[in-house]
Amino acid sequence: MINAAPGHTLIGADFSAIESRVLAWVAGEAWKLDSYRRFDATHDPADEPYCETACRIFRVPSGSYTKDSPERAVGKVCDLAFGYMGGINAWRKFEPGRFTDDEVKKFCSEWRTSHPAIRKLWYAVDRAALVAVRERGRVVRCGPIAIKSAGGFLLLKLPSGRKISYPLPRAVGDAERQHVTFLDNAAGQFTECRGGHGAYGGLWTENVVSGIARDLLAEAMLRIEAAGYPIVLHVHDEIVCEVPEGFGSTEEFIRLMIRKPAWALELPIAASAWSGPRYCKG
């Protein structure tokens, strides 16, 4: 537990479902974007996007579920587990035992059917990376992303202009089923990506979405500090500041948090805020 200094209070906010929103935006999943925009405008429980996802999973009319419906949890876990080509194993990380494998397989199939643009993105970004490695120097575009091989790196340029660099990329596999591998230091030392199995559409998509979400958080941090809110910590997509008692408001904090950068004007962004004498994540 973290306590504010005497005479001070903590104020914080976190983005709402930011990866789901960014994924829908990058892919151009129109119904999902409309669902978030509608909910942000109305805050009607029947418009809650995880409820809408659940309606599509169970093939019932929109508005059939609310935030109190148990089916909403299925919609939420589907979004968390399946957005990057995940299946049963990904599901089990979020919900270990309530449903059978056959039920989870059906959820996955229904989720993919209801998200055609996201499915298309997985394969498009994988193909774009492969073309960029084969044809070094060529800029290959995939939606708002630009990919290029240069100087021993595969460079994935995000909408913000920031680049994610993948060292020593190469194409491996037979002519019909090639994929890109690169050196990965995620474990603290450079090894072949995924033990030599290489990258795939879900991995590229996760990197893109996480990178964009990071850029949104970084720009929000700069705005918030410039407005006089000193940041004391951030956890995932949450920012926490310590301010003198009576300074600022959660309403202003949210406005600062969700202000859209010029490169993401069509991305629906929302946040929730809190204030109090102590911070406890649990």
Question: Where are the predicted features?
Answer:
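Conserved catalytic core of nucleotide polymerization and phosphodiester-bond processing enzymes
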Residues: M1-G282
